[in-house]
A protein has these predicted regions:
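Active-site acidic catalytic loop and adjacent metal/ATP-binding pocket
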Residues: 32-38, 45-46, 159-206
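Active-site activation/catalytic loop segments of kinase-like enzymes and analogous catalytic loops
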Residues: 205-232, 244-263, 272-280
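ATP-binding pocket architecture of kinase catalytic cores
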Residues: 26-129, 149, 167
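Activation segment
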Residues: 51, 95, 191, 199-201, ...
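Glycine-rich, phosphate-binding/catalytic loops in enzymes
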Residues: 62-63, 106, 209-211, 268
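An alpha-helical support segment within catalytic cores of ATP-dependent transferases
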Residues: 3-19, 120-175, 180, 185-187, ...
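Start-of-helix signal in alpha-solenoid helical-repeat scaffolds, especially tetratricopeptide repeats
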Residues: 237, 241-244
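Amphipathic alpha-helical coiled-coil segments
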Residues: 277-290
């Protein structure tokens, strides 16, 4: 049974139907299998996590996050989460994925969603960014990888940046606020924020930095819209710091995925992905000192 046949069978079982059909696979992410499925005239998404996804996501925490964020009306309705396997069935949102648009033209809509999240009383756990990075580095070492000297030096520099921004107030954050996780409804007036598995208490600029996955210029543009003025040196440094951190995190995730065989399984060179993110992290760290 291939993954599409499996998903059809699971949706039929969960929805007590026999007419589930695959509509399409959704792109995005580095290894998950997420499909749009239709049954009884209604569309859903079904997610099957990729190999070793459990290393990076606590599914019980994801379920708790979903229950919390439902109060804001920003996410799609989740019908089912299997906390052991990480499989998830949710209602499909008709609209346009932000990454497929002129992203900056929707900054006002995006800022409104961010400020709704950041000013809320949602109760999330501490995101614990550097604890996560420590874990990611350890996973790589356990697979026989030795971080090169250039990485160690950059990590030390990142630790120094962290100390400089230690007093920032933590607020509820999505922590994966990249345009592929945002959907604009068909009227163009409402933004849905999807995939809350990484949500936690964090610096609100961390969410803005996530826009860098679509190009760091997008994060800079969103920052200006968020603060409603030309960003100060301190504000820019916070953004550069968080994006540098994210790039090092992606570096380790990509190295791990290559070491467990996902480069071959998914026909994606994760070593090249790792190099891309490391080079970006180094560039951001170098520019940080000039701000």
């Amino acid at each position: 049974m291939n993954v599409e046949e499996y998903i059809v069978a699971r949706v039929n079982a969960l929805m007590h139907t026999e007419d589930a059909v695959i509509v399409k696979r959704l792109e995005g992410g580095m290894s998950n299998y997420t499909y749009v499925v239709e049954t009884r005239g209604k569309r859903y998404t079904y997610r099957v996590p990729g190999k070793y996804a459990e290393k990076f996501v606590d599914r019980v925490e994801e379920w708790d996050n979903i229950q919390e964020v439902n109060r804001l009306g920003l996410n799609n309705a989740t019908s089912y989460v299997e906390v052991i396997s990480g499989e998830k069935l949710a209602e499909y949102v008709e609209g346009t994925i932000m990454s497929e648009t002129d992203i900056e033209s929707y900054n006002e809509l995006s800022v409104a969603a961010l400020k709704c999240i950041h000013s809320s009383d949602l109760r999330f756990k501490d995101y614990n960014a550097f604890g996560r990075l420590d874990d990611d580095e350890r996973y790589c070492r356990e697979m026989g990888f030795t971080h090169p000297k250039a990485y160690v030096e950059l990590r030390h520099k990142l630790d120094a940046m962290r100390a400089a921004h230690a007093d920032v107030k933590m607020v509820p954050c999505h922590c994966d606020y990249q345009p592929t996780n945002l959907v604009i409804d068909e009227k163009g007036t409402k933004l849905y924020v999807l995939d809350w598995e990484f949500a936690g208490m964090n610096d609100p600029f961390y969410d803005i930095a996530c826009y860098g996955n679509a190009g760091f210029d997008k994060a800079l543009s969103l920052l200006k819209a968020y603060v409603c003025h030309e960003p100060t040196s301190e504000e820019l440094k916070r953004l550069y710091f968080h994006r540098c951190f994210q790039c090092l995190q992606w570096f380790n995730v990509a190295i791990f995925k290559d070491r467990v065989g996902l480069s071959k399984d998914l026909n994606m060179d994760f070593n090249n992905v790792a190099t891309f993110f490391f080079d970006m992290a180094k560039d951001l760290a170098d520019k940080y000192d000039t701000l």
